[in-house]
Curated annotation (Swiss-Prot):
Localization (cell): Cytoplasm
Gene Ontology annotations for the cellular component aspect, listed alphabetically: cytoplasm
Function (record text): Required for maturation of urease via the functional incorporation of the urease nickel metallocenter.
Keywords: Chaperone, Cytoplasm, Nickel insertion
Subcellular location, principal: cytoplasm
A Pfam family annotated for this UniProt entry: UreD
Name this polypeptide is given: Urease accessory protein UreD
Source organism phylogeny: Bacteria, Bacillati, Actinomycetota, Actinomycetes, Mycobacteriales
Family: Belongs to the UreD family.
UniProt-recorded Gene Ontology molecular function terms: nickel cation binding
Keyword tRNA-binding: no
Organism: Mycolicibacterium smegmatis (strain ATCC 700084 / mc(2)155)
């Protein structure tokens, strides 16, 4: 993916001594980049909150970002909270384009927080992930439907996550589209957590029991790229709680091979 010159955030993390630090920090509106915090229990892990000063994405917005983790760095990049996707009748679609790169022996968790789809909003997300041998990335993609949405005001949200090798070869592509209200009102929040790279594969073990209001399933990605944990939840709060509980160890060691039934609301394609 070729990012345009006016990328909103261009960040590089690397290991420096016992810590992970930012070695490249370029950003503009709407992002605000603060400091990297070290975990007292795990000083090698650096955590950064990627703040959207606008707090919303409006029709016509195109937000591009690139994040790299190199030289054995271990970084967790989180959003400051759920972001509204605004819309107007007949308005332009908005878009977010993200490029993630993790080199050998480095680790990244990217959790930008759920997007909240509001009336008439049309939004596209494109995320490209490249993980070198012995590196790993955990990528969270989540959306919550605003409770006031109905068939007359429902717009659309499209999300495509692509996994490529360092040489550019396509390993996996997962595309999801939601352009109408779910058939039932049981689930209004949806997420997928992608575990890409060293050691992440779908297994044949029974997964943990789903908590009330949550349905989960695990998909093994093609070409040994990793696995994806799909989540449907009753609401945004339930989804966020489950995302916090979900760990890489759980997905790797206790992944199940269940798949969603045809009644799930997203149309999905995977190659």
């Amino acid at each position: 993916m070729k990012l345009a010159e006016r990328t909103a955030a261009d960040l590089r993390f690397a290991r420096a001594g016992a810590h992970t630090v930012l070695t490249r920090r370029r950003h503009r509106w709407p992002f605000v980049i603060g400091r990297v915090f070290a975990d007292p229990q795990d000083p090698g892990l650096g955590t950064l909150t990627l703040q959207n000063a606008a707090g919303t994405v409006i029709p016509g917005d195109v937000i591009r970002q690139r994040i790299e983790v190199v030289d054995g760095g271990r970084a967790a990049v989180n959003g400051q909270g759920a972001t509204l996707i605004s819309g107007v009748p007949g308005g332009d679609a908005s878009a977010e384009e993200t490029e993630l790169y993790v080199d050998a022996h480095s680790w990244l968790r990217f959790d930008p927080a759920p997007r909240i789809l509001t009336a008439h909003a049309r939004h596209r997300q494109r995320t490209e992930v490249c993980v070198a041998h012995r590196g790993c990335a955990v990528v969270v993609d989540a959306v919550v439907l605003h409770p006031d949405l109905d068939a007359a005001t429902f717009g659309s949200i499209e999300s495509t996550v692509t996994v490529r090798s360092p040489g550019g070869a396509l390993l996996a592509m997962d595309a999801q589209v939601l352009d109408a209200p779910p058939v039932t009102g049981r689930f209004t929040a949806f997420g997928t957590v992608y575990f890409v790279g060293a050691g992440f594969t779908g297994g044949h073990h029974e997964g943990p029991t789903d908590p009330p209001g949550v349905y989960t399933a695990v998909t093994e990605l093609p070409n040994g790229a990793g696995c994806a944990v799909r989540i449907a939840a009753a609401d945004g709060g339930t989804l966020r709680t489950y995302l916090r509980l979900l760990s890489a160890e759980t997905a790797f060691q206790r992944a199940s091979t269940r798949t969603f039934t045809d009644g799930m609301p997203f149309r999905r394609s995977q190659v």
